[in-house]
């Protein structure tokens, strides 16, 4: 592996991509440390500490997890882009025009990316406006009595909203730069470094509050989860494919045997990111409703969220989170892998699965195999995401868990890490170097 890493640095083009990616990630972490103008940073920190100890502490920790501590600086981070991506992906099933764009290849994908950008900016404006409005009237963080925004004039509030929206656009631009000119998926890598940046502080918190024995147990559990995740992520069902010989001009092509790899976890970490992003929406709605009513009384929605969606050990919370992961796993697999299209491509180039007729029977067979491996893959994702949260919640005696050591964070970090390593490996293999993974 060391020799492969040295080879990647010796290759000029690959070295440029790796250094470019690292440079953007460093720039992202530096920009993430800058608070929004007009915001009392110390008061925000104090309010965050009070809020994470309350009933919605899990959600505040979750938002900070994905944004790399953006909530501490009163910024929006990557959340608008994630939400926009979810909506655009859902629209490909609902709106025929989006389905046509998805089938148009690179041109259609570029158009959908453009729609995602526009929607992300609109959501960033909406989210920034909501955060500033809630922070101005004291309804952003539960139990917070501090003055977060000192100057509450219209001009000052508009400037804060514009700066927060510009920050979200900058984060989106950084992610797309990494995807286009660097290595790996840009937005996933930004989430990755956001989680990694919080590990030392959260580890120290566990060590100080729970002692060395609990800290060692948590590290051991995280190590076991990492080994299990890597094992499952590398698992795949290989469907043999043969290509018939055919004459093109004066040359004979085909006659080779290969395989079609179908991963056990075909969807990757996307379902976990989508489900974790959606789980905080009920709390945002609750805050808006509570702010609109002046904090007087509690609606049925407020009571439902406070009772069932605030405690990660609650059975309703676990079932909803687990169900969202399974839903997004099936949904994302159906969007990214189309058995009919794959069967048509194989038939076009003279490929066939031994024992299966080309065309419709091949598509039905691929659909059957995919459905059989997607179910255990979705259950695996849900179990890894839910069980460590429950165990750590019980071990803390009811305190809010440290999310960077939970299943959601481990899944995201391992999934993004493996995907990035595989991209580097493919670049090395194209240049006749030995890869990382053997």
Swiss-Prot record:
GO (cellular component) term, any one: plasma membrane
Membrane topology according to the record: Multi-pass membrane protein
Gene3D superfamilies assigned to the protein according to its UniProt record, in alphabetical order: SecY subunit domain (1.10.3370.10)
Cellular localization per UniProt: Cell membrane
Signal peptide positions (record): none
Protein origin, superkingdom: Bacteria
Membrane-crossing residue ranges in chain numbering: 18-38, 76-96, 121-141, 154-174, 177-197, 212-232, 269-289, 315-335, 375-395, 398-418
Gene Ontology process terms (BP): intracellular protein transmembrane transport; protein targeting; protein transport by the Sec complex
InterPro entries attached to this UniProt entry: SecY (IPR026593), SecY/SEC61-alpha (IPR002208), SecY_CS (IPR030659), SecY_dom_sf (IPR023201)
The keyword Transmembrane is assigned to this record: yes
Family statement drawn from the similarity comment of this UniProt entry: Belongs to the SecY/SEC61-alpha family.
Role according to the record: The central subunit of the protein translocation channel SecYEG. Consists of two halves formed by TMs 1-5 and 6-10. These two domains form a lateral gate at the front which open onto the bilayer between TMs 2 and 7, and are clamped together by SecE at the back. The channel is closed by both a pore ring composed of hydrophobic SecY resides and a short helix (helix 2A) on the extracellular side of the membrane which forms a plug. The plug probably moves laterally to allow the channel to open. The ring and the pore may move independently.
Protein name (record): Protein translocase subunit SecY
Organism this protein belongs to: Mycobacterium leprae (strain TN)
Name of the encoding gene: secY
